[in-house]
Amino acid sequence: MPAEWEPHAATWLAWPHYEGDWPGKFEPIPWVYAEIIRTLAKHEPVELVVTNRSAAKSARRVLERAHALSDNIRFHYWRTNRVWLRDSGCIFLSKRQPGFARRDHPGRLCPQKNGEAHEFTGPVKQPKNDGALAPEGPIALKFRFNAWAKYSNWRLDDKIGSLMAKAAKADEVHPESLGARIVLEGGSIDVNGAGTILTTEECLLSKEQERNPHMTRAHYEKAFADYLGAPHTIWLGRGIFGDDTHGHVDDLTRFVSPGTVVTMVDSDSSDVNHGPLRANLRRLQSARDQDGKQLTIVEIPMPQPVLFESRRLPASYANFYIANGVLLAPVFNRPNDGIALNTLAELFPTREIVPIYSGDFIWGFGAMHCMTQQQPE
């Protein structure tokens, strides 16, 4: 799986329509989308999912008023439950990934037995021309999606990844473990593009909001190696407070280069996030990458608490999105906004750092990274 900073063919988004994600605060949300799309479309194509032609007409009006309508935007008329394509959409890979094309297993990802004698295999759509044993074009991993094992409205979203794969003319792969499809969200992982992946125990190994009851730590690690080309996993502990996904790593720690991560910290010992973030920092300090090298760790302070209706929201500067030539950074009108922006600017000197006010948007429990899905070149 390529790192997010590698060249993109496009960014995928879904236009907001489900007011239940932002109850009482939906009105400003389309305008936040317009700002994001205006920025992205200057740098790369935008694949925009709308529920129907009426929704497309409404979206066009907003985009036009925001000076964001562009020939670089392509509309797709697909019904969705929610807009979080990072999690419901497919995960695009580069043209060839480790594990493909074992001659003795035609048409499937290369199964490799682990210590418990289980195999990880998944069907691959075959090219029709020469009977090749592995896809030569783009690859789309279509994991199952069940709304973070929390919400009941997910069945339309579970179909979106396949529609994206077809529109991108990608070979669709259905990852499996022990003969069952794997449930996995894009926000639960982060990769360096060189063989190392970040995830959390709270999200994947907890019995609460359990995605895959049949899978153990070893099963996940084998799946990451076989399907994502990431044979080395760094496990963090708990995510940030208020995250309804139960521990997504994209609110916590992110790769910014093959050997460097940014991680959220909180110096206030009385804050609910202080202990878990400190524990994760210790794990990172003792972690090694796929080559056995120590990570360079850059700390970013959490934003001062963001609350709405007396509820602590999962505001985090880690939920940025890296696109071609630009980085979209969530800000919350908090004193630590400037520290986060300056840190990201130092880490990405060749990219424009664009702050996106997310104080209203975060009421939906997600920000820039949660709503986007990159399609690599």
Which residues does each PLM region occupy?
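The feature marks the mature, well-folded catalytic cores of soluble enzymes
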Residues: M1-Q97, P135-E377
